[in-house]
């Protein structure tokens, strides 16, 4: 599946201050095919396994505590 990587806090992986290869590395770490820093804000990955958590507007819990 494709989507934004999500951390344990429910927030998208930020890439604003990261090196250019950061997102591609993080995506491959979770068995994704490739990834990039979308609009310099968050990591977007391609072809990840279904078990990888991705961000969704309907299940967004970033900034809402646990």
From Swiss-Prot:
Tissue expression as described in the entry: Expressed by the venom gland.
CDD domains per UniProt: neurotoxins_LC_scorpion
Protein localization: Secreted
Alphabetic keyword roster: Amidation, Disulfide bond, Ion channel impairing toxin, Neurotoxin, Secreted, Toxin, Voltage-gated sodium channel impairing toxin
Disulfide bridge positions per record: 11-62, 15-37, 23-43, 27-45
Pfam families linked to this entry: Toxin_3 (PF00537)
Source species, domain of life: Eukaryota
PROSITE patterns, A to Z: LCN_CSAB (PS51863)
GO biological process: defense response
Key word Transcription regulation present: no
GO molecular function term, any single one: sodium channel inhibitor activity
Gene Ontology cellular-component annotations: extracellular region
InterPro entries the record matches: LCN-type_CS_alpha_beta_dom, Scorpion_toxin-like, Scorpion_toxin-like_sf, Scorpion_toxinL, Scorpion_toxinL/defensin
Every LCN-type CS-alpha/beta domain range: 1-63
Annotated function: Beta toxins bind voltage-independently at site-4 of sodium channels (Nav) and shift the voltage of activation toward more negative potentials thereby affecting sodium channel activation and promoting spontaneous and repetitive firing.
Entry note about domains: Has the structural arrangement of an alpha-helix connected to antiparallel beta-sheets by disulfide bonds (CS-alpha/beta).
Protein family membership: Belongs to the long (4 C-C) scorpion toxin superfamily. Sodium channel inhibitor family. Beta subfamily.
Entry protein name: Toxin Tppa1
Species this protein is from: Tityus pachyurus
């Amino acid at each position: 599946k494709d989507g934004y990587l999500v951390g344990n806090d429910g927030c998208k992986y930020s890439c604003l201050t990261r090196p250019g290869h950061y997102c591609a590395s993080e995506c491959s770490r979770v068995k994704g095919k490739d990834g990039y820093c979308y609009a310099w804000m968050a990591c977007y990955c391609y072809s990840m396994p279904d078990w990888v958590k991705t961000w969704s507007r309907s299940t967004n819990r970033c900034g809402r505590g646990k």
